[in-house]
Amino acid sequence: MNVSQQIEPRAAASERNMADAIRFLSMDAVEKANSGHPGMPMGMADAVTVLFNRFIRIDPSLPDWPDRDRFVLSAGHGSMLLYSLHHLIGFADMPMAELSSFRQLGSKTAGHPEYGHALGIETTTGPLGQGISTAVGMAMAEQMMASRFGSALCNHFTYVVAGDGCLQEGISHEAIDLAGHLKLRKLVVLWDDNRISIDGSTDLSTSMNQLARFRAASWDAQAVDGHDPEAVAKALERARRTRKPSLIACRTRIGKGAASMEGSHKTHGAALGDKEIAATREKLGWPHPPFFVPPEIRAAWAKVAARGRTAREAWDIRLDASRSKKRYEQTIRRQFDGELGDLLAKFRSAHRTRATKVATRQASQMALEVINGATALTIGGSADLTGSNLTMTSQTQPISPGNFKGRYLHYGIREHGMAAAMNGIALHGGFIPYGGTFLVFSDYARGAMRLSALMGLPVIYVLTHDSIGLGEDGPTHQPVEHLAMLRATPNLNVFRPADIIETAECWEIALGEKNTPSVLALSRQALPMLRRTEGNENQSALGAYVLREARGNRDITILATGSEVEIAVAAAERLQAEEGIAAAVVSMPCWEKFEVQDLAYRRKVLGDAPRIAIEAAGRLGWDRWMGPDGAFVGMTGFGASAPAGDLYRHFGITADHVVAEALELLRRAYSETLPIGARIGPHPSAHTVRSSQEA
């Protein structure tokens, strides 16, 4: 049976009335809120009605049905289009009261769609270009799942509504190029080609031939009248048959139907006003009061939900009959085998015995070799830095056009597109994506990384070459402010491990996260194994811990992360040997994990002695751990081009400098009357902090 035979025909007149319901709900909600964007929902109501009424398979009674079609409103400012649809097809959490509470505190109808805030919202959109780029990841995941479980269990489309702004954003170029290369044939983008931007006509800023652009990227591209239901339906039928991703340029008029403002940029981001809405009701023959939908139109929309429910029930039968049911359900839930934790514990024990000295990026690859061998859930990748990020292992064969059985994506030099695609893979379900680039290039991925955190997605960012330790490539490639930027992001774990033991621990934590993305900031340079104590406890899970306790009562505490923990240990040993100063070293691989520990633990780790912090990055954020009188050894500006060792010496990030700073800190904290080599005891106002052996 061909596609057209599978699609139930609908009368255009009925669809016009169904579309008008979207228009008036959108107008009414924006008017009541006196805030919002009515123009896009009004303009795209006709095309989206055809999509939902004839094609899309969604079951509102089971919104997370794994084989549902995905609908992504990339032009998220038109959120009332989505909320109106959800109300009309019967999502339980979208009664009319929610529409009338649009953009109000505590409502389900936020200004832009937010994943997890209401049922059926596939991804958070609003930053233009993110939705279409995230949808590329969803389409990838669909193809990967289909290659593993067959079309009987995984056979759905990803539909996107994108606007002019989405296609102007740079991330769209990355996503479109990658989707075309991979031939993501179940990705269909309906472009709201209204040629209007906030400032006015789009010809103020662009002359782009978007159809030619998409065709150049190996997409199928069509142009239709977006207000002609049969033309839209015919284009969708073709899109569902093609072997490429599809663009349907829907030529529309923003604010379609408005009495006097149709086609005006003024309908984009403001309420139309009582008079304009009243005139529009008269023009379109809609005599109903605000927030009212006639029963016959509700009945028409209810058929959309019924069709979706029928499709879902048929899928349930296929799943129950499948020999792969258990494996499928474990995969879609991202359920690990229990042996992974044991394997990583053995890994740590073996390398502790060997005292393995490697760069933490290499330690990451070694840990990934264990992880990827123990689970098939992980999907790796890199933005054209595989050999530097070391994100590929023996189990991760590349994914290529027509072959989605692999477990590794060559994203190309598309950091932002990679991050958004990983969001889409995570949102789809079935996989845990990780992807690599240099830490400094997190700038390019920032928009999508922020959405990872906002949505609470278990995406893992492998960000290597994490400091001036990368050396000769110079300040363009040396991150200074990036750790502070990432740590300032809510709900993002930033791990900076000090050695192979901590690296394996950080991977274990990241893989266990259900609602938080992770960053692994990893070194280029080799680092010694520092954790010599035996035990299976994952100390990095505490965020910070005492790596080296002082001999006796602490005189000073040295805090550090990553490659600078080695420097902290060397400085502590010199302070003890040369100055008789008892120094403890605290490794802080994850501030976010440390700050959620109880107060007693944090006090025990940090102690009451003066503190000095070391990190080959900017100071911002460290004062909360150092205290008001602490000292910082790190970067105060951009780096330089030179061998790594020379740079550490040039910028004073050395054990010598730490010792000097520690002595000065102690002089200020206690008394300048003591000889430099004298035994300096605890601060008179401080509580005595005993070593772990004495506690």
Curated annotation (Swiss-Prot):
Keyword Transferase: yes
Entry keyword set: Calcium, Calvin cycle, Magnesium, Metal-binding, Plasmid, Thiamine pyrophosphate, Transferase
GO cellular component assignments: cytosol
Binding site for substrate: 37, 268, 361, 388, 465, 473, 524
Pathway the protein acts in: Carbohydrate biosynthesis; Calvin cycle
Subunit structure: Homodimer.
Gene (name only): cbbT
Organism: Sinorhizobium medicae (strain WSM419) (Ensifer medicae)
Protein name as it appears in the record: Transketolase
